[in-house]
Structures are given as structure tokens and as C-alpha cells.
Swiss-Prot record:
Its main location: cytoplasm. Residues 76-88 have a biased composition (Basic and acidic residues). Expressed in trachea multiciliated cells. Residues 163-258 are annotated as: Interaction with TRPC proteins. Keywords: Calmodulin-binding, Cell projection, Cilium, Coiled coil, Cytoplasm, Cytoskeleton, Flagellum, SH3-binding. This is Enkurin. The IQ motif is involved in calmodulin binding. Residues 1-26, 76-98 are annotated as: Disordered. Residues 163-255 form the Enkurin domain.
Amino acid sequence: MVAMDPTGPSESIYNLIPSDWKEPPQPPRYVSIFKATVKDDMQKFKTAMKTMGPAKLEVPSPKDFLKKHSKEKILPPKKKFEWNERRKPPVPLRTDHPVMGIQSEKNFINTNAADVIMGVAKKPKPIYVDKRTGDKHDLETSGLVPKYINKKDYGVTPEYICKRNEEVKKAQEEYDNYIQENLRKAAMKRLSDEEREAVLQGLKKNWEEVHKEFQSLSVFIDSIPKKIRKQKLEEEMKQLEHDIGVLEKHKVIYIANKK
């Protein structure tokens, strides 16, 4: 087989040289990285002998052949019926005749008439007719009669709601009292002259101590810790001077009561 080079000239003596064509090697086969995991899961959740049955099945013996009536259901043995309840008295015989000739002095006509006269007349059930053909319906359950608005407790607030409103009102009063008590405890308290003077002297004493420590610093501040210490002392002195100025300027001072 002669291979033609498409990039070179169309005709060349070198094109007549036969070339050995080799089949390129196949790429490696794809193997999933989850193959072992899937295999383990299949072994874990697989039910044994579910599709093909057990590996070895015991062959029935020729001696245990199917016998006649062996598949029929065997009924339980019969039990004797026993009646434990008390029996009724026997029916009278044909030869037994009732006692005849017994008379009563009760006047059933007058008794029935008196019962009718003294009895309460039955009231007809109220009905209504909604069609000309005479279709009757119960009037009480129809909703046409004002039944509930005529009740004694109609429009009256139920007892449980009144009780609940009282509980809510009581809880609100307790909450308001609690808030007022906290506000009273956290009210502003006036600082007395003795306490103001004691606080002022304490601040001045602290300022003197910080100022003395500031004067003890070295002349040359050539390190970061020294600079930080100097800045800290300057801030403390500045804050103390501000507090002293406030106390000296204002004679009446109120503070928050934290008790």
C-alpha cells in the first residue's frame, strides 16, 4: 500500500516506498471507581435464592406419593350441643281449658270516658307546606321559626369568656405593676455632696497615680510596647481629666439606680 502525503508535493519518488501501517493501540477500558461500592451494596441488599430457588432441593421420595383425600380439609370433631339458659314454660295442652265464668265489676266504658276527658289533648306537630302538591316538612328544624333568638341567654356573653377576660385583665395588671416597680427601682438618684466630693477626690488621686507613672516613662520611646504604654496612660489621664471637669462643673448630679 502506498501512502500519499497530502501536505507534500502531488508527485514524489518517495511516495512509492511502501509504509508499514500499524493499528493504533486501544484506549484503556473504563472502570468505574464506584464498582466495589456497588458490588458491596448488591451483596448486602440481595435476597438469597429469590429468583432461581435454593441450590439443592430435596427430591420427594417415591414412598411419599399423593394419596386419595390427602388434600381435603379435616373438620374438627363434633361437640355435643348444650343449652345453658333457662327454658320457657311449656305450652298448655289442648285438654287444658281456662277457668270460665269470672266476672269483673269494673265499668270499662265509664273508665275510658273519664280517661279521655281528664287526659291532655295531643298537640299536632307543627309543619309547613312548601308546594301546592302538599309536601309537608317539620317546622321546628326548618329554621323558619325564631328559636335561638328567643332564648333567655341570647346575646349574653358566656361565663367562660367573662372568666377568661378577668384572667387576662388580672395578668395585665400584674405585668403593669411589675414594669412600674422596675422603673421605680431603675429611677435616677441624686448624688449627695459628700458622695460627690468623695468621688472627686478619688478621681484626682487616680489622676495623680497615672500622672506619676507617666512621668516615670523613659525619655526615648524607641519600641512599640513603650509607645502603646504611653498612649494608654495618655488616654487614662484624658478620661480622668474629663470626669473631674464634669464633677467640678456640675454641682447637682444624678446617677442611675442599679439596685
